[in-house]
């Protein structure tokens, strides 16, 4: 696939240009070809109903893959799903996939898991692709240099029917993170610090490209974490240019090209970089050396501070809207200004989600938990992002580390990231979570969520208060 030639384009612009079927010439949306469509049980039922009513087939079932993730339990997966709504959604997905000829990985399948973990581990996610799913965190796949975005149910139907999507071109943003990350600081801390800096609307209307030496030094898992939470910064998508780290991750994956096809793909992938002199609509800079473990205190991902800080005082916030939002958040979170973040006790710790449910994340958690115990009164759930991640963790002995420490080692699924399955907080319970959203009630009605990295989650489970691994020494 040869790239179109034009002077000084960004990575996002290159991928976009290569997928324009019909140009709207700025008077209408461009019609964009979609390379991979991922489907799950929550946002697809009405889309399939629309196809059925119109008598349409799925245009490219071979470019469509489905998995069960949002509503599935993470224990007793061999038993019927207890919640009737969840059970209906899962059963409906199975019927729809069978009727329309779509590949499905159901509960119990070795490839089942969170859709944004399954795609990369199978090698379905590749540089230069356009990828969509009826899920906002589709941006995860941008870590591979793909243009990946969440879409609504009506758009899901459009892609199923045509393998295309009408889209207006996006603005572009460069986030430059240079320098060396201090020990104990991770990709999750980078993205939480960025969102605190630019706000949850800072990236609105943009595709963010993450650049700089700190980004280049990250593993693919770390890059996926950052691209995943681009949505919490208000962006439409996040991207990282592919490099040797990307290629080595993809090599020998089940759906990665091989032989001459690998060589051809690699030649294309190596062109997927922002050209020198390309102009971004917005640029943001972070100094990696100045970052430290980061946590949220409020009810949106932008309400965060370094772990070493205190709960902020709304009276010191100049903007009226932000001050009122902070006051409301502190009331919901039951926190007082000036309280040290490290003194905030938790009832639960959740490790998992499409943000931090991969094998690298579990290794970090195991390293902290090894030889230690979860604090009395704290419940810790560790949920792999896929069954293959779980199998790898078992092979490495991580599952035993988790259970010996007193954590609950679960099956794959979205779990406590959102209150759509049995894994939920009780009203008033406080949780340190490696997921991506801390909205009111996100983890269950009345639940209080602090977003953290896997390392901070593990240390918090041991101490019982928000903590970093360094606090355990």
From Swiss-Prot:
Cofactor: [4Fe-4S] cluster
CDD domains for this protein: IPMI
Pfam family, one: Aconitase
Residues reported to bind [4Fe-4S] cluster: 354, 414, 417
InterPro entries the UniProt entry points to: 3-IsopropMal_deHydase_lsu, Acnase/IPM_dHydase_lsu_aba_1/3, Acoase/IPM_deHydtase_lsu_aba, Aconitase_4Fe-4S_BS, Aconitase_4Fe-4S_dom, IPM_dehydratase_rel_enz, IPMI_cat
Domain of life: Bacteria
Similarity field: Belongs to the aconitase/IPM isomerase family. LeuC type 1 subfamily.
Alphabetical list of PANTHER family matching this protein: 3-ISOPROPYLMALATE DEHYDRATASE (PTHR43822:SF9), HOMOACONITASE, MITOCHONDRIAL-RELATED (PTHR43822)
Full protein name: 3-isopropylmalate dehydratase large subunit
Species of the source: Mycobacterium ulcerans (strain Agy99)
Lineage: Bacteria, Bacillati, Actinomycetota, Actinomycetes, Mycobacteriales
């Amino acid at each position: 696939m040869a790239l179109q030639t034009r002077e000084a384009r960004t990575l996002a612009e290159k991928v976009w240009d290569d997928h324009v079927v019909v140009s709207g010439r700025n008077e209408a949306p461009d019609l964009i070809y979609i390379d991979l469509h991922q489907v799950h049980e929550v946002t697809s039922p009405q889309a399939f109903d629309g196809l059925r009513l119109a008598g349409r087939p799925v245009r490219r079932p071979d470019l469509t893959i489905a998995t069960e993730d949002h509503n599935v339990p993470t224990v007793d997966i061999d038993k019927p799903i207890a919640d009737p709504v969840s059970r209906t959604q899962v059963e409906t997905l199975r019927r729809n996939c069978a009727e329309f000829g779509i590949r499905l990985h159901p509960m119990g399948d070795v490839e089942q898991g969170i859709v944004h973990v399954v795609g990369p581990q199978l090698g379905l996610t590749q540089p230069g692709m356009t990828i969509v799913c009826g899920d906002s965190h589709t941006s995860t796949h941008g870590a591979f240099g793909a243009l990946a975005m969440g879409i609504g149910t009506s758009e899901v139907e459009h892609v199923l029917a045509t393998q295309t999507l009408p889209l207006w071109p996006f603005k572009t943003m460069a986030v430059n993170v240079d320098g060396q990350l201090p020990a104990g600081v991770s990709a999750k801390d980078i993205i939480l610090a960025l969102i605190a800096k630019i706000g949850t609307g800072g990236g609105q209307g943009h595709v963010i490209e993450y650049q700089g030496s700190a980004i280049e030094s990250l593993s693919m898992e770390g890059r996926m974490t950052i691209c995943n939470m681009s949505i919490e910064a208000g962006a439409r998508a996040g991207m990282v240019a592919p490099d040797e780290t990307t290629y080595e991750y993809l090599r020998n994956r089940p759906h990665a090209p091989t032989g001459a096809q690998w060589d051809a793909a690699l030649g294309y992938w190596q062109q997927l970089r922002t050209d020198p002199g390309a102009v971004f609509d917005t640029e943001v800079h972070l100094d990696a050396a100045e970052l430290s473990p980061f946590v949220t205190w409020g009810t949106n991902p932008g309400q965060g501070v370094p772990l070493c800080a205190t709960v902020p005082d709304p009276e010191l916030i100049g903007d009226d809207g932000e001050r009122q939002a902070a006051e409301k958040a502190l009331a919901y979170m039951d926190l007082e200004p000036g309280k040290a973040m490290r003194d905030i006790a938790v009832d639960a710790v959740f490790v998992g989600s499409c943000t931090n449910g991969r094998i690298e994340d579990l290794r970090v958690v195991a390293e902290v938990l090894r030889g230690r115990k979860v604090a009395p009164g704290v419940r810790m759930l560790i949920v792999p992002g896929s069954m293959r991640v779980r199998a790898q963790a078992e092979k490495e002995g991580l599952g035993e580390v988790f259970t010996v420490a007193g954590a609950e080692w679960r099956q794959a699924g979205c779990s406590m990231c959102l209150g759509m399955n049995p894994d939920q907080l009780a009203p008033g319970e406080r949780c340190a979570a490696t997921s991506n959203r801390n909205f009111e009630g996100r983890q269950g009605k009345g639940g209080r969520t602090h977003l953290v990295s896997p390392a901070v989650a593990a240390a918090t489970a041991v101490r019982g208060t928000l903590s970093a691994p360094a606090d355990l020494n």
